Structures are given as C-alpha cells and as structure tokens.
A protein has these predicted regions:
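Conserved ABC ATPase "signature" C-loop
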Residues: 219-220
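ABC-type ATPase nucleotide-binding domains, specifically the catalytic core motifs of the NBD
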Residues: 78-80, 100, 104-118, 127-130
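Conserved catalytic motifs of ABC-family nucleotide-binding domains
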Residues: 161
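Helix-to-loop junction immediately C-terminal to a conserved catalytic motif
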Residues: 58
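ABC ATPase "signature
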Residues: 225-226, 234
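Conserved ABC ATPase signature
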Residues: 140-144, 148
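The feature captures the beta-strand-to-loop junction immediately N-terminal to the Walker
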Residues: 43-45
Length: 250
C-alpha cells in the first residue's frame, strides 16, 4: 500500500474516532497510533470497543467521524485490493471455510488480491507457520486440531505479505499448552517479518508478554496507552488500576 508515511511516522493512526451502533456509542473520541514494527494490544472488558477499533483499520467498520490511516493513506479512500494487500486479519477461532481445503483457504486472500501465484503464496505461508504444505494443504479444517486451524488462519493472513497484522482474540479459544505454542509462532514471525500488529485480547498477561505497548479501553474510550511498566507503575485512572489488580498483574 503506497501511502505518504515517512520513517518514524506511525503505520496505523486513528484520530478522534466516533462510532455509534444505534443508541450505543462504541467509539467515543478515540485516538491511537501504532509505530512501524511495533505490536500494540487492545485490552478491556467486553463491550469496551476493542474489536470495533481494530476493524476500523481494515474498513470492516467505518467510523461516523474522525480519520483512520494506514501508512499515511486514509482507509476510507483506499482501494480495497491495496488495503487487503497491506493489512492481514486473523479473527477469533480462525474463520476458515469448512468446505474448502486448507490450501484453498490460505490462498483466498492472494486470489482476492488478483495474484496469479496464489497457490505458491499459500504454500509458502503454510511453511512459515510450520504446517507442511504437502501434508496439511489437502486437508479439511475439521481434520486439524484447534491450534493447527489457528496457525492456518495466521498463514492466510500472511499469504500476501502484509505490512500490518490485525488479530481479534486469536488465541482465546485454544487450550493453555496450544495457546503458548501459537503465541510463540506469532511472536517469532512478527520479529522475522518486521510486522506491525494490533492485537485484541482479554488476557492482560498475554498483552504484556506479546505487545510493546497496551491500550486500555473502557466504554468506547482509551483510558491509557503505554508499555506494561507504565501501566503498572503509573496507572492513569482508577479503572486501569483495578484492571491490573483483577488481572493479577499489579
């Protein structure tokens, strides 16, 4: 995605976003910037606006006011193909199409993006996440474990070599051992590929372990943004303090 950002500028930038769903104010004057190569986590209770904010960066949600940019280009003005090439998306429990093989699932994004080598890209992405294409490519999603399905979903998001990865509670449905395994794969790939990432999670420990900075949300607003140390040592509001305590990290 050829935007107008310069070195040092945030790759993801939201300015004074507001979004209503009927009478519910889901985003209330929200601003957030994520620098190149950083992983930020969005945390907060259910209904705090985390997923709504995440989805403004790939145009799944259109804010009523404010501006969202990726690499300096307003998302609302971006060509859909260019946006999909730049921004990968992993949803909770993967979202694999059950009647498609794993290889076809992973090839979906490059195919939508008009790539002529979509199968080659899919196989390379499966390799990236540790799923041998010859073995896992012909299988159906139901034949894979939960961890393998989520790795395939991660491969699909990476298949067109995006600059940005958006992840909506990607590890929440996994058992404890599998969760750690997939988290390690994500962390290694993020470093290897120099990805910028925005992660939604309910797990404060997960946020602290995987993210460079954490944004705490409540009632559609961002209460505080910063590295784990600043949230623990200098919580900006009583809500942030209580959230740290409830999560057992304070």
């Amino acid at each position: 995605m050829n935007g107008t950002s310069r070195p040092g500028d945030p790759l993801l930038h939201a300015t004074r976003l507001e979004k209503r769903f009927g009478t519910i104010l889901a985003l209330d004057d929200v601003s957030l910037s994520v620098p190149h190569g950083q992983c930020y986590a969005l945390v907060g209770e259910s209904g705090s606006g985390k997923t709504t904010l995440l989805r403004t960066f790939n145009a799944m949600v259109r804010p009523d006011s404010g501006q969202v940019t990726v690499a300096g280009r307003p998302v609302g003005e971006s060509d859909p193909v260019a946006l999909r090439r730049s921004v990968g998306y992993v949803q909770q429990e993967g979202g694999l199409l059950p009647h498609w093989t794993i290889e076809r699932n992973v090839a979906l994004v490059p195919r939508l993006n008009r790539r002529t080598d979509s199968l080659e890209r899919a196989r390379a992405a499966l390799d990236l996440v540790g799923l041998a294409p010859a073995d896992f490519g012909p299988r159906w999603p139901r034949e894979l474990s939960g961890g393998q399905r989520q790795r395939a979903a991660l491969a699909r998001a990476l298949a067109d070599a995006p600059d940005v990865l958006l992840l909506d509670e990607p590890f929440g449905a996994l058992d404890a051992i599998t969760r750690v395994e997939v988290q390690r794969i994500f962390a290694a790939l993020r470093e290897r590929l120099a990805l910028t990432a925005l992660l939604v999670t309910h797990d404060m420990r997960e946020a602290f372990e995987l993210a460079d900075a954490v944004a705490v949300m409540k009632d559609g607003r961002v209460e505080q943004v910063g590295p784990a140390e600043s949230l623990l040592e200098e919580p900006a509001t009583e809500y942030v303090r209580e959230l740290m305590h409830k999560a057992g990290v304070a």
